[in-house]
Amino acid sequence: MAGELISFGIQNLWNLLSQECELFQGVEDQVTELKRDLNLLSSFLKDADAKKHTSAVVKNCVEEIKEIIYDGEDTIETFVLEQNLGKTSGIKKSIRRLACIIPDRRRYALGIGGLSNRISKVIRDMQSFGVQQAIVDGGYKQPQGDKQREMRPRFSKDDDSDFVGLEANVKKLVGYLVDEANVQVVSITGMGGLGKTTLAKQVFNHEDVKHQFDGLSWVCVSQDFTRMNVWQKILRDLKPKEEEKKIMEMTQDTLQGELIRLLETSKSLIVLDDIWEKEDWELIKPIFPPTKGWKVLLTSRNESVAMRRNTSYINFKPECLTTEDSWTLFQRIALPMKDAAEFKIDEEKEELGKLMIKHCGGLPLAIRVLGGMLAEKYTSHDWRRLSENIGSHLVGGRTNFNDDNNNTCNYVLSLSFEELPSYLKHCFLYLAHFPDDYEINVKNLSYYWAAEGIFQPRHYDGEIIRDVGDVYIEELVRRNMVISERDVKTSRFETCHLHDMMREVCLLKAKEENFLQITSSRTSTGNSLSIVTSRRLVYQYPITLDVEKDINDPKLRSLVVVANTYMFWGGWSWMLLGSSFIRLELLRVLDIHRAKLKGGKLASSIGQLIHLRYLNLKHAEVTHIPYSLGNLKLLIYLNLVILVSGSTLVPNVLKEMQQLRYLALPKDMGRKTKLELSNLVKLETLKNFSTKNCSLEDLRGMVRLRTLTIELRKETSLETLAASIGGLKYLESLTITDLGSEMRTKEAGIVFDFVYLKTLTLKLYMPRLSKEQHFPSHLTTLYLQHCRLEEDPMPILEKLHQLKELELRRKSFSGKEMVCSSGGFPQLQKLSIKGLEEWEDWKVEESSMPVLHTLDIRDCRKLKQLPDEHLPSHLTSISLFFCCLEEDPMPTLERLVHLKELQLLFRSFSGRIMVCAGSGFPQLHKLKLSELDGLEEWIVEDGSMPQLHTLEIRRCPKLKKLPNGFPQLQNLELNELEEWEEWIVEDGSMPLLHTLRIWNCPKLKQLPDGLRFIYSLKNLTVPKRWKKRLSKGGEDYYKVQHIPSVEFY
């Protein structure tokens, strides 16, 4: 395996040496000799790689070759950079002062000659220990295996291919959670690769489970979890999104109290995926109260994690797949059938395939990975070779994994890595940077790969970095080595992660190759992958980092800080100490996002990192960017979205970075900052471009742009904007914010003629959409704000047949009527309408928006009624806020047979009476009525809302009476009902009620007598003024004596 990785490095060095001849004037002889030596060296790699396991000396030779290649890249690249700098006119004095600016040809001749001498020595050493030379004709050749693997066509992955032989298991687990009231904790245990997480996901997403529980939470626990993080994740999942910031600021004690109260008063399912030790469960467990509304589903390799000798704990051990199911799963992946009727498998392949899957032992992960490998191999010869390799691995018994039970699976997973092309090996090893269960941002990952030189020139030359990254991720996904799915709206891989066992392979291979070193603040001694200094260093969850004291390797190529997303929500940051980067001058990648810098100033020595390709300062606390940043001419990624309250000073040096592909500018650079960006013609992403600091003319040449966010000032005309961006025909995402839009009353609009555009956000004055002014037909997401459209936009927008999400935000439409025509919006799934001050009438024709599932209308105060008919029948969630509907909306809404969640909030209905007819709302699960100031009477007829399990009524000051019924109701909260005086609970009403909370209802004198017949009630919260009468010996104690938990506030 090291042979291919080294071959990859030799190829990169060869490419450097094969640049323009004039660059190497004065050292031509040394360069020619080095190329010849590299060619000779490559001929020994295959045999050296095979013998390194049996000879320590050969292994040391292989390590020395890696160092030679790294040093060669550093030497040659530095020479080329200095040559180019020497040719540049007008070089700043500060750059001249750098020791490396004036090329010393004699010094480099000696350096390159030294590389040749080291290669000659290592070849002699290998030959003396029997390493054989292979014949290589001509110049450096890429390994043939890489070429063959790249030429093979790609196949799309069948999303259902993993789900074989699990149906009975899912049914049994759902039964434990839904039907068996005494079961509290269900654990799925077994060896790695058995499909425990896949099984848990199927259960988690099961319709019966969603219907049974009010709240669902999924937490990946992993080995290095903290109790605080797990508790925060659970509470965030169970609470509204608006409360995330508040949750992240809670102390551990407050978190525990909130979770106990919540789990006492609601039915929740918590999935804890990948718990390693019994002690981990004991740490998490204190949030679960003795009441039984909650349930836990956990997965673990350790059967003892949640074992208890009582019936409330169930341990479920899935069986390995049968031979028949194993073959079915294997066929779906390795031999996808285009036409099952005509498909006939090659007999030899069938025999070899069935032989190989025996080695997988019925483990789904091993079968999927084996299938992914063989899907890439067409000939029976390839299949036979792989079958022999698997057999030799098993017979040889060589492994570094600890768990003997998993050896079979680990052999197959390890072999899947060995079968990768060399460039994909690097891509896969790079994933070792990230913690367990980390959702890796594929776009950022693509730029890491590009900055490290992992992209192959034939893939990278002229291509968009994001596109190449997507191709590489797709190849790893297709081989079942990485888990990811394409986003519905963007059609891209947005995030990816590793299966826990595949991550073990990744960490093991990274350790074997000394690929990187990991240091984590969560461990007392760090988690170093190698005692040997690595060229890559990653800090996970740092608190402080001193670049002068903590980093000792001047040859370091990559320094990355990694933290989970939840840390960002909690305002996490860390302190970067040390003022000099001088000792790190060979860095290619520097990611110090969220760093606090002393005095808010980035050290000027950053400019000496002339090899740097990737610099991430996102959300770092920086107020000044030094002029020396202009020295970083090789940068392809620069993120300056700084986290400071005021403006950030950015000198006019970005124009020097002509290799930039990604640039995110600070949101506020002050009026004095003026940037020239016309040289940055390779940009693919440009964010926070403002005409206050930049010229629109500079955009004309950026024809490679895919993502652009732009802010206009009042002195900028829309004609100028249109002329500047009109040629950016490859744009996929565009955001325009016009801060001077109301000054442009006489200007024409913009024609958005971008055929590849998928996401468009417009925050600008645009009163008319002319016939010529159309939107791109491939749009999937559209946000409009401050447009003040005078005419109904729906006739134009509904013709966007790919549109999946539409938001009409504040002041986007100033007219009174909107009409959604029959057949319009065929793919729209989510519609949000907010802040339309003049909108009064909404008509929806039959068959409009046929797949719409979410509707949110807020702050549309003149909208008096919903469409009488033809609201999309597939709606599952509706939220109305401050709409002032005059007519009762229930007769319209109750006909929506798929509706599961309904919120009528803050004056969304101004009438006195609401009536829910019998048989209405057949699937409604949750209903919230809040701040309906005029509501006096709410009538619910028998048979209405038969599935309702959560009802919340708040701040309805005139409501005097509550309806009866609700046969499935489990949670009821009544808050600030000022006129509510009497409550009658009839016999048989609310037979499943579990939690009841009554707050601030001053006229209600006592609890209803019928409450004593609701034996399912477990939690009751009532006013403190009732404490005496409800306590033991009190006059109403008989009403509550059967309730386990009664709280008084």
UniProtKB/Swiss-Prot annotation:
Keywords: ATP-binding, Coiled coil, Leucine-rich repeat, Nucleotide-binding, Plant defense, Repeat. One of its GO terms (molecular function) is ADP binding. Residues 139-158 are annotated as: Disordered. ATP binds at residues 190-197. InterPro entries: Apaf_helical (IPR042197), LRR_dom_sf (IPR032675), LRR_R13L4/SHOC2-like (IPR055414), NB-ARC (IPR002182), P-loop_NTPase (IPR027417), RX-like_CC (IPR038005), Rx_N (IPR041118), WH-like_DNA-bd_sf (IPR036388). The keyword Phosphoprotein does not apply. LRR repeats lie at residues 584-608, 609-634, 657-682, 683-707, 776-799, 800-827, 849-873, 896-923, 945-968, 990-1015. The keyword Iron does not apply. Residues 144-158 have a biased composition (Basic and acidic residues). Residues 147-460 form the NB-ARC domain. One of its GO terms (biological process) is defense response to other organism. Residues 25-41 form a coiled coil. Pfam families: LRR_14 (PF23598), NB-ARC (PF00931), Rx_N (PF18052), WH_DRP (PF23559). CDD domains: RX-CC_like. It comes from the Eukaryota. Potential disease resistance protein. Belongs to the disease resistance NB-LRR family. The LRR repeats probably act as specificity determinant of pathogen recognition. This is Probable disease resistance protein RF9. The gene is RF9.
